[in-house]
Amino acid sequence: MDRLIISPSPHIHSGDSVERNMYAVLIALAPACLVSLVTFGLGAFIVLAVSVLACVLTEWVITKYLYKQPSTIGDGSAILTGLLLGMNLPSSLPWWIIVIGAIVAIGVGKMSFGGLGGNIFNPALVGRVFLLIAYPAQMTLWPKAGQYLSYTDAVTSATPLGIAKGIQAGTPGMSWDQIPATSDLLFGIHGGSLGEVSALALLLGLGFLLYRRVITWHIPVSILATAFVFGGIMHLVNPALYPAPLFQLLTGGMMLGAIFMATDYVTSPMSARGQLLYGALIGLLTILIRLFGSYPEGMSFAILIM
């Protein structure tokens, strides 16, 4: 009698292995990482390097000494978690806070559930939200673009979403004139976390993932379409208070979340209909949090809630 073998997700039904898909996502992230390095210089390099190394080391230690199993770092998932965590952080974040975030991301968000396939939340987002709650001051300092040799001493400025939130709150000195031009939002000439700076670079990554069939269009398109439509409705209701819908797509973690985080195999639906509903609710929640919540950005919370 044949045995029924039960194993945790992700269950890959194509010819691609988990490892090949992980490394394909790493390749897709390369343009955005390059833009962040060009935009923030030394700070971006330190954040990404520390995040990746800390995530890989944390997984290796837990696997070897706690689970007493062969190392799993070769599958690329720890590297990807480290890269995604780093892309969700400001370039001025002290290295020791990055290490704490990596330990939480891998130790709590992934390995506490048994490792890859068992986790119910995206590990990088678990680490990011933990740091946002534990170290709100450091996590909301946004260095200006172009300070290539600065790290923790970089001159900071408000992000586009921070300016929009300030306008909604009636903060003196905040105006729509301070918002970067659309071209700057596309190419990355503004402040923010490493993964916020260039929508165009992230869209290039999306094209690669779709071409390689690593992901399907359902989740990214449903997130972006819902955010655009709902953001547009709110802009029509009060254009002086709520930004235009294109602004919602090009700022914050909208592109990074829609393309690289909400599409996580383990924590997203498998059916096309489920993915469309899942994406639509993430897009709706993100705009609701941005416009009516206490945080300027809502993508991380929306994905974790869903």
Region spans (language model):
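C-terminal ends of transmembrane helices
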Residues: 9, 57-69, 106-117, 204-213, ...
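Alpha-helical transmembrane segments in multi-pass membrane proteins
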Residues: 24-32, 47-59, 77-82, 86, ...
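Structural signature of hydrophobic alpha-helical transmembrane segments
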Residues: 41-54, 92-101, 185-199, 242-254
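Small-residue-rich segments of transmembrane alpha-helices in multi-pass membrane proteins
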Residues: 77-88, 125-138, 226-234, 253-260, ...
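Long hydrophobic alpha-helical segments that form multi-pass transmembrane helix bundles
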Residues: 117-203
